[in-house]
Design a protein with these regions (language model features):
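Alpha-helix boundary/capping residues
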Residues: 135, 273, 277, 333-336, ...
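N-terminal Rossmann-like NAD(P) cofactor-binding subdomain of oxidoreductases
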Residues: 2-258, 292-296, 320, 342, ...
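Oxyanion-binding "anion nests"
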Residues: 262-315
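A structural signal for well-ordered alpha-helical scaffolds and beta->alpha junctions
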Residues: 144, 213, 263-267, 326
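C-terminal active-site/capping subdomain that shapes the small-molecule cofactor and substrate pocket
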Residues: 298-303, 308-419
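Short secondary-structure junctions and interdomain/linker hinges
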Residues: 77, 126, 262, 277-281, ...
Length: 419
């Protein structure tokens, strides 16, 4: 038995095809029809890092999108000039979208994407923010910029899955089911840029493990007020390490109790996401990092031999006394409704609450709401803090490209993206 406020059927992925490379690419090309333009605006989008794991996921999500049209694909120099189907080692369980298969891969330079209205970045962190990786010209003067910043400076709207700008004080770090209001800082980001930008900005989505954590925490803070303390232990899927990822001899028959930088990301990102935006004396906007009600987060992160789906065991302490009961927590989680109405890729139900004692499980629950929702189970009293429970989220969907896609949809609906 599960509860989402209404009956929900867990969606399974579309039919699979064999995971072959470019030699058999023609058999991996999707022939599915697009939505008509009557479904919404026709917005040209580009994908950076299109041959990588996150880039491939972006293309799967964009293939039949009612608003966004795949217009440009960028990748590393070894792929530039090739048709996408011949450049990519396709690793998704659905075919290569037919819209992308014959597109010629472009070099990741802003001038090659200038006719796009939105750019999705699936670049690895070491490229997304590495000085000297990308070049472009203004008034014939060569400039060396951080890669994603170069696209912003070219007045392009960038939605990034990389970590590089998450700590920037003017860049929103958005989990769309949690803090879409943080898009309000974008005009300030544009105004502070030199020259001032009309259309360009950067929005980042959170680390995959942070995303699964903050959605239930947001639901609980909305229902019961501030949370004071969070203890979280993660069991993270190997797909979170990208491809080819963790060597098989390291992960088979094993658990690796360390993921570099992961714990620090969870502890810091949670504060920025769940915090608000305040105004300083000079009228500028600042992320308050949950300072009005200090929140402490302690994370322990582990890599486990699961392909997709991050599991997290969480204990929380509320500021309110007495704290809510386990039943009140279950009801609040099931009733949670995020501010994503009108977004085509947003889940109808953000959280499913399981009553069975052995749920959620990655194999059974990672495709809830097509991977865009979060599963919660084992809600019970905690003898050290107040309440403890288990979270399961799909790290390659809501934990990565799906979040970035919904962020872009929100930006369109709120008029942040100029179309």
């Amino acid at each position: 038995m599960t509860s989402t406020g209404s009956t929900t059927t867990t969606k399974r992925p579309l039919s699979s095809s064999s995971r072959t490379g470019a030699d058999n690419a023609s058999s991996l090309i999707s022939k599915s029809p697009r939505h008509t333009m009557q479904d919404g605006p026709s917005i040209k989008v580009g994908v950076l890092g299109a041959t990588g794991t996150v880039g491939q996921r972006f293309l799967v999500l964009l293939a039949d999108h009612p608003w966004f049209v795949i217009h440009a694909l960028g990748a590393s120099p070894r792929s530039v000039g090739k048709p996408y189907a011949k450049a990519v080692q396709w690793k998704q369980t659905t075919p290569i979208p037919h819209q992308a298969a014959d597109m010629i891969v472009r070099e990741c330079k802003p001038e090659n994407f200038i006719d796009c209205q939105i750019v999705f970045s699936g670049l690895d962190a070491d490229v997304a923010g590495d000085i000297g990786k990308f070049y472009y010209r203004i008034l014939d003067q060569p400039l060396i910029l951080l890669a994603e910043a170069a696209f912003r400076s070219a007045d392009l709207a960038v939605f990034s899955n990389a970590k590089n700008y998450r700590r920037d004080p003017h860049v929103p770090l958005i989990v769309p089911l949690v803090n879409p209001s943080h898009l309000s800082i974008i005009p300030q980001q544009q105004a502070l840029h030199r020259p001032t930008l009309k259309k360009g900005f950067i929005v980042t989505n959170a680390n995959c493990s942070t995303t699964g954590l903050v959605i239930p925490l947001c639901a609980l803070e909305k229902a019961f007020g501030p949370i004071e303390s969070v203890l979280v232990t993660t069991m993270q899927a190997i797909s979170g390490a990208g491809y080819p990822g963790v060597p098989s001899l390291d992960i088979l028959d094993n658990i690796v109790p360390h993921i570099g930088g992961e714990e620090e990301k969870m502890e810091w990102e949670t504060l920025k996401i769940l915090g608000g935006i305040t105004e300083s004396d000079d009228g500028s906007k600042l992320f308050d990092m949950h300072a009005k009600h200090p929140l402490r987060v302690s994370a322990s992160c582990n890599r486990v031999p699961v392909i997709d789906g991050h599991t997290e065991c969480v204990s929380v302490r509320f500021a309110r006394r007495p704290p809510p009961s386990p039943q009140q927590v279950r009801e609040a989680l099931a009733a949670f409704t995020p501010d994503t109405q009108g977004c085509p890729s947003a889940p109808r139900h953000a959280i499913v609450v399981h009553e069975q004692p052995d749920r959620p499980q990655p194999r059974l629950d990672r495709y809830f709401q097509n991977g865009a929702g979060v599963s919660v189970g084992r809600v019970r009293q905690c003898q050290v803090l107040d309440i403890k429970f288990v979270i399961l989220s799909n790290n390659v969907s809501i934990g990565a490209a799906t979040s970035s896609l919904i962020n872009a949809e929100l930006a369109v609906l709120k008029g942040v993206v100029v179309v």
